[in-house]
Amino acid sequence: MLLAKGGLHDGDYRFKEIIGSSQRAACLASGECDAVPLSQPEDVVFARKGFVKLGDSLEVVPNLQFNVIAARRSWAATHANAMVALARAFGATFRFLRDPAHRNEVVRAIVETTGADATAARAILALYYEPDRGVMPKQGEMNMSGVAAVVALLGTAGRIPPPLPPAERFVDLRYLHEAGLQ
């Protein structure tokens, strides 16, 4: 979709499967790859090195559920208290991340966990929150229209056969409801 938005069509490029943003970054840095999808902080770091950002996935899919925590339904059902506690912890974490009063602490955490510098960490936060692009939950809630967009993308890629199931097939909201987050 992003390639088509840029005017490229099938046959204009070839794909090479490289799993992991840091591995794709290494392919780009070595010159073996001409362009690669990168996540943060690699995209910020490479832009600062002079590489050109060709686009952003949010340009073509602005409403997408990016991250989830998955558990087997059978395990979750027998560990409901842990599921609710985890949901509450995630809610507190996302509220903390969004609060500008904690920005410096969040920047330090990004630096410590990713190895990026503070400038890159601030750029990552700006990407998500300045303005708020709806990428990250406000308090750990599930973006069901974003899940539906993921299902549609998987259908387009042939990973889920038609007819496409509803997003609710893949998500059990009871723990988020019990935690007061959904």
Question: Each PLM stretch: what is its role?
Answer:
Residues 1-48, 144-149:
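Bilobed "Venus flytrap"/periplasmic-binding protein-like clamshell domains
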Residues 18, 43, 61, 169-170:
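Positions that flank functional sites
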Residues 8-10, 116, 159-160, 181:
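Helix N-cap/coil-helix junction residues
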Residues 23-114:
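Pocket-lining segment of extracytoplasmic ligand-binding domains
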Residues 20, 58-59, 172-175:
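Residues that form or immediately flank small-molecule/cofactor binding pockets and catalytic motifs
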Residues 148-182:
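Conserved C-terminal helix/tail region of periplasmic/extracytoplasmic solute-binding proteins
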Residues 77-161:
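Secondary-structure end/capping motifs
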Residues 3, 46, 110-111, 154-155, ...:
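Hydrophobic alpha-helix position signal
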